[in-house]
């Protein structure tokens, strides 16, 4: 079948992906003696859809997977999704809420049925989208963190760590989300600076000798105070340490204590201590053996330990009621505006409460030492290396991990309680009953933090706790590709769990990617209205549909108008369909070792043009190869030209550069090496040189050029395949047979290796000279204002043998009438170009008067531009106020105009 005239990605992508997957090409293969290469997909939330960050990282993982698969490794890319406890429960609860049903109306069992139902219908969206991106994980091994095998691993770990004394139950202060009704980890807390107040309140001394003025930003927790504190070296209050004050409203007696935690400069230097509602106060309370009185319910209302008139009030209503009461008693001294950090839940944006609750914790200190030892020994490396510091700092300051969550969706904690509240940790209820002597038991209602099961992902997916062949072969895995935002949440925890439970690190390297931002460097977010959907970049989207997408479901609907305005301005014609390959090439080109990635659609357009260029180059090659002798027979004589040897040598350089780039995770450099070889060397130079050979060469030369056209293109397609899989497969199917290569798919063919015998330094040097001569000739044509249609002669003073060899190429590429070697250039007014020790001149009869007039006019124009630029740069308000980049741009313009003027004046002078 003939290759289509233009590259239409949609049909090609659909056809090839289905063929690859159904043929089982993505499956891990067990080749004896081949090295193992394994990547674990960071399991996306089952609730999720593919966002730009996913698409970026999945492109890089797939490029590595395809590269190593083609390099002959036993390659496994392990896919799967995360049950995403909180996120999934929120989604399903919202759906029920729309029907005026709460999860409590349904009960736990029915609610979980609804969640599994939802997962069955919507849970595969993200994996469908991954397929659209051309990713090639082993789908036959796809896992879900709530699968039976993974759940078994979770239970085994919990029981094992409990028996080792690393998991314990205790009453501790946790971050409590009153909307979700669960504890959340420190890492799920978003603290933002907000406007508030600081109140000063008088606490009367119990002996009636006066009062202490306390400064607080949380007056509603006053009812739970169990002390007031001053700094031990604060002379203002030294005489009061050990005395007691009367707690307003609650009318309890509480002590005045001294603790270095108190900041003498904050407020009055006296602070209230509420151990049950503040993390710092909890620590103070532990040091001074203070009682912890919790005055809030789990939904942030005042509880039964408060005076009757406050019970049942929302925390903020209680605040106002309490302030009014203090005012009435003359105890409220002042209320001053104050900026403070407010902790909110990253899912609900609710203000979190430090809450004293019974929770399960994991002791982290010993595990953290193992995590630190892994980087110290070199077992684990971060790329870029500077992320090691971030990892290390967190592990050195680690706190015990609260692993329990008050949710219904997730891995239920394998602990059972008897009627007396005694608990038994076991693999099954039957095992727990044996421990309890057959007593009636009830399972703990809590589930484990989602990150608990995620921390086991690298080895649980390989069959642990069973000692499977896959576990032996693939652990430690090769590399984890992840964002810097989950180094704490996930990376460090995987390292600690894996080291402790298997004795091995989970991966040898962690490649930390940057964050994909918009073209202006802004973080992509729904509220900013700057989110791009990778599928829209593949398929294209009309501006109206894009606006609708960006303005739907906004938390603040008032933003819709400004988002629509910005979107219509940025994308007046919507977004064009770039296809998967162009999008992947764009992502690869942006994958530098920096922290942030600015995604610019112009790049996607540039790489779509690249795909079109590669397609058209292949069409040209096929037109000159199909039905012709392509030199596949070994006994056929071939006469390779310098051009043939040069392109073969340049290909070796590109192959070497790509290998180095993949080894260093420099996907940007791999993309650049492919781009520059295909566009700048194969298309712009070699195809033009090949035309000369094919049109004017001997049969042996033509055969050699066809052989080179085919083999270099076939190798280039294999070289580019990991980055742009679809177009390379489609083209390879047509080109490979002509290069004498046979196989079912490019993705199963061997990755190109450098062939030192193809370096050809002599040919490379001669072709470099040819390029310089052609470029000099093009410059001369430009200076003389010659149209491409004017085929004029060129004379070159230099080595006649070299010139005569290169002449046919120069005629074609320089659009010349002929090229002659001369011992000396003729006397003429035409400009002369120098290339090494060669001098060259176009032989053109020119109308001197007309040319002088043209040059004079151009000189006057350039002088005007120079004056404008100089005036601008002499203006202090421009230089001082304009952005540095704008000033530099103006300086560069001035330098360019000055160089141009020099050239034009020299040409004018030569004409006399």
From Swiss-Prot:
Q: Where is this motif: 'KMSKS' region?
A: 523-527
| Residues noted as binding ATP in the record, renumbered to the chain | 526
Q: Which InterPro entries match?
A: aa-tRNA-synth_I_CS, aa-tRNA-synth_Ia, Anticodon_Ia_Val, M/V/L/I-tRNA-synth_anticd-bd, Rossmann-like_a/b/a_fold, tRNA-bd_arm, tRNAsynth_Ia_anticodon-bd, Val-tRNA_synth_C_sf
Annotated GO molecular function terms are:
aminoacyl-tRNA deacylase activity; ATP binding; valine-tRNA ligase activity
Alphabetic keyword roster: Aminoacyl-tRNA synthetase, ATP-binding, Coiled coil, Cytoplasm, Ligase, Nucleotide-binding, Protein biosynthesis
Identification of the protein by name:
Valine--tRNA ligase
Single GO biological process annotation from the record: valyl-tRNA aminoacylation
Entry EC number(s): 6.1.1.9
Q: Which GO terms describe its cellular component?
A: cytosol
What Gene3D superfamilies does its record include? HUPs, Isoleucyl-tRNA Synthetase, Domain 1, Valyl-tRNA synthetase, C-terminal domain, Valyl/Leucyl/Isoleucyl-tRNA synthetase, editing domain
Organism classification: Bacteria, Pseudomonadati, Pseudomonadota, Betaproteobacteria, Nitrosomonadales
Question: Which segments of the protein form a coiled coil according to its record?
Answer: 847-911
Its annotated function is as follows: Catalyzes the attachment of valine to tRNA(Val). As ValRS can inadvertently accommodate and process structurally similar amino acids such as threonine, to avoid such errors, it has a 'posttransfer' editing activity that hydrolyzes mischarged Thr-tRNA(Val) in a tRNA-dependent manner.
Subunit annotation: Monomer.
């Amino acid at each position: 079948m003939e290759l289509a005239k233009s590259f239409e990605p949609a049909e090609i992508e659909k056809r090839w992906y289905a063929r690859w997957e159904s043929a089982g090409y993505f499956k891990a293969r067990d080749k004896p003696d081949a090295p193992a290469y394994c990547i674990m997909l960071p399991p996306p939330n089952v609730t999720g859809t593919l966002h730009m960050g996913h698409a970026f990282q999945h492109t890089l993982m797939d490029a590595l997977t395809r590269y190593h698969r083609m390099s002959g490794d036993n390659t496994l890319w392990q896919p799967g999704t995360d049950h995403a406890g909180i996120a999934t429960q929120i989604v399903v609860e919202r759906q029920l809420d729309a029907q005026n049903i709460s999860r409590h109306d349904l009960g736990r069992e029915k609610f979980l049925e609804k969640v599994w139902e939802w997962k069955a219908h919507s849970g595969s969206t993200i994996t469908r989208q991954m397929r659209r991106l051309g990713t090639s994980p082993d789908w036959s091994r796809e896992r879900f963190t709530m699968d039976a095998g993974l759940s078994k691993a979770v239970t085994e770990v919990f029981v094992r760590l409990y028996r080792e004394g690393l998991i314990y139950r205790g009453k501790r202060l946790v971050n409590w989300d009153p909307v979700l009704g669960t504890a959340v980890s420190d890492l799920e807390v978003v603290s933002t600076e907000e406007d508030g107040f600081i109140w000063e309140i008088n606490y009367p001394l119990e002996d009636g000798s006066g009062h202490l003025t306390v400064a607080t930003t949380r007056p509603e927790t006053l009812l739970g105070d169990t002390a007031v504190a001053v700094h031990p070296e604060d002379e203002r209050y030294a005489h009061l340490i050990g005395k007691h004050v009367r707690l307003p409203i609650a009318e309890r007696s509480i002590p005045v204590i001294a603790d270095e935690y108190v900041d003498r400069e904050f407020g009055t230097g006296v602070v209230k201590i509420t151990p049950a509602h503040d993390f710092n106060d909890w620590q103070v309370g532990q040091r001074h053996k203070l009682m912890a009185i919790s005055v809030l319910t789990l939904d942030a209302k005042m509880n039964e330990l408060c005076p009757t008139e406050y019970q049942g009030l929302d925390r903020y209503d209680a605040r106002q009621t309490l302030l009014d009461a203090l005012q009435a008693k003359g105890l409220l001294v002042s209320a001053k505006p104050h900026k403070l950090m407010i902790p909110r839940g990253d899912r609900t944006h609710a203000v979190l409460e430090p809450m004293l609750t019974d929770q399960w914790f994991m002791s982290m200190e010993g595990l953290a030492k193992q995590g630190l030892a892994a980087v110290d020994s070199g077992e684990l490396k971060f790329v870029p290396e500077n992320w090691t510091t971030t990892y290390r700092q967190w592990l050195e300051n680690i706190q015990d991990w609260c692993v329990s969550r008050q949710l219904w969706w997730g891995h239920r904690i394998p602990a059972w309680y008897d009627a007396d509240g005694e608990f038994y940790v076991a693999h099954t209820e039957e095992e727990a009953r044996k421990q309890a002597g057959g007593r009636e038991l009830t399972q703990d209602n809590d589930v484990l933090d989602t990150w608990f099961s995620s921390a086991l992902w690298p080895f649980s997916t390989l069959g642990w706790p069973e000692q499977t062949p896959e576990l032996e072969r693939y652990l430690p895995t090769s590399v984890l590709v992840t964002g810097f935002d989950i180094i704490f949440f996930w990376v460090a925890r995987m390292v600690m769990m894996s080291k402790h439970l298997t004795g091995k690190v989970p991966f040898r390297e962690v490649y930390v990617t940057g964050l994909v931002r918009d073209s202006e460097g802004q973080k992509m977010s729904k509220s900013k209205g700057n989110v791009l959907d990778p599928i829209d970049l593949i398929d294209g989207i009309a501006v109206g549909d894009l606006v609708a997408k960006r303005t739907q479901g906004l938390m603040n609907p008032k933003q819709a108008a400004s988002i629509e305005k910005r979107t219509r301005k940025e994308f007046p014609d919507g977004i064009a369909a770039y296809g998967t390959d162009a999008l992947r090439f764009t992502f690869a080109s942006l994958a530098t070792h920096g922290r942030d990635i600015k995604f610019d659609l112009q790049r996607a357009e540039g790489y779509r043009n690249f795909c079109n260029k590669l397609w058209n180059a292949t069409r040209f090659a096929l037109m000159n190869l199909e039905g012709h002798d392509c030199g596949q027979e070994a006994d056929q004589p071939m006469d390779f030209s310098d051009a043939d040897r040069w392109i073969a040598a340049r290909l070796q350089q590109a192959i070497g550069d790509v290998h180095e780039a993949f080894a260093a995770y420099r996907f940007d450099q791999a993309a650049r090496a492919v781009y520059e070889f295909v566009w700048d060397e194969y298309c712009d130079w070699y195809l033009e040189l090949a035309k000369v050979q094919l049109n004017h060469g001997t049969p042996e030369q033509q055969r050699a050029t066809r052989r080179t056209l085919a083999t270099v293109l076939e190798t280039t397609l294999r070289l580019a395949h990991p980055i742009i899989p679809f177009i390379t497969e489609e083209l390879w199917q047509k080109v490979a047979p002509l290069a004498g290569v046979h196989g079912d798919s490019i993705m199963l063919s061997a990755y190109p290796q450098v062939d030192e015998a193809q370096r050809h330094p002599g040919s490379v040097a001669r072709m470099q000279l040819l390029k310089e001569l052609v470029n000099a000739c093009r410059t001369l044509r430009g200076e003389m204002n010659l149209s491409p249609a004017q085929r004029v002669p060129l004379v070159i003073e230099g080595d006649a043998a070299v010139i005569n060899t290169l002449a046919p190429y120069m005629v074609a590429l320089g659009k010349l009438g002929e090229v002659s070697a001369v011992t000396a250039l003729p006397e003429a007014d035409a400009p002369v170009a120098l290339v090494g020790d060669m001098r060259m001149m176009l032989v053109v009869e020119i109308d001197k008067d007309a040319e002088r007039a043209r040059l004079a006019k151009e000189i006057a124009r350039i002088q005007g531009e120079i004056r404008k630029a100089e005036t601008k740069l002499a203006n202090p308000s421009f230089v001082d106020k304009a952005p540095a980049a704008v000033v530099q741009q103006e300086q560069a313009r001035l330098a360019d105009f000055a160089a141009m003027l020099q050239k034009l004046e020299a040409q004018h002078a030569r004409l006399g």
